[in-house]
Amino acid sequence: MIPGEIITKSTEVEINNHHPETVIEVENTGDRPIQVGSHFHFYEANAALDFEREMAYGKHLDIPAGAAVRFEPGDKKEVQLVEYAGKRKIFGFRGMVNGPIDESRVYRPTDENDEYAGVFGDNGAENVNKKGRKRS
């Protein structure tokens, strides 16, 4: 053995096994490239990314830690997401959750007059979280 040498097994390493998977189609509708990292809460990804946000709630990309997926302007691709494990609490990112991952906390706009409707350029059709406020 050489000092500092790391000896690893020659077998393949499985990541995120035993976690339910979700596949969604994502399109970059913006005019700049967007990169999303492995542990970023995909639900809170850049608003120029068009996808079914509710399906991404509580999930991150199913890729190795430290990796990222890049979306060039106009790109449309499928990505695989997995649920967060552990205590299932999310803080930071875009500040849309800041607490436990709980479907009852997902804010759903009620009509076109809702002050938060249209945040994602969809006239309120998408679901967004309103700083932990419970839906009615």
From Swiss-Prot:
Give the reactions, separated by semicolons, that this protein catalyses: urea + 2 H2O + H(+) = hydrogencarbonate + 2 NH4(+)
Where is it mostly found?
cytoplasm
EC number annotated for this UniProt entry: 3.5.1.5
Entry's Gene Ontology BP terms: urea catabolic process
Does the record's keyword annotation contain Hydrolase? Answer: yes
Query: Which intervals of the chain are annotated as region Disordered?
Result: 113-136
Its UniProt pathway annotation is: Nitrogen metabolism; urea degradation; CO(2) and NH(3) from urea (urease route): step 1/1
Gene3D superfamilies (UniProt xref)? Urease, beta subunit (2.10.150.10)
Q: Which GO-annotated molecular functions does the record name?
A: urease activity
Give any Pfam family that matches: Urease_beta
Q: Which cysteines are joined by disulfide bonds?
A: none
The terms describing its cellular component in GO are:
urease complex
Subcellular location(s) of the protein:
Cytoplasm
In which domain of life is the source organism classified? Bacteria
Q: Which residues form a coiled coil?
A: none
Q: How does it assemble?
A: Heterotrimer of UreA (gamma), UreB (beta) and UreC (alpha) subunits. Three heterotrimers associate to form the active enzyme.
Family listed: Belongs to the urease beta subunit family.
List the NCBIfam families.
PRK13203.1 (NF009682), urease_beta (TIGR00192)
Q: What is this protein called?
A: Urease subunit beta
Origin species, per record, is Staphylococcus aureus (strain Newman)
Lineage, top ranks: Bacteria, Bacillati, Bacillota, Bacilli, Bacillales
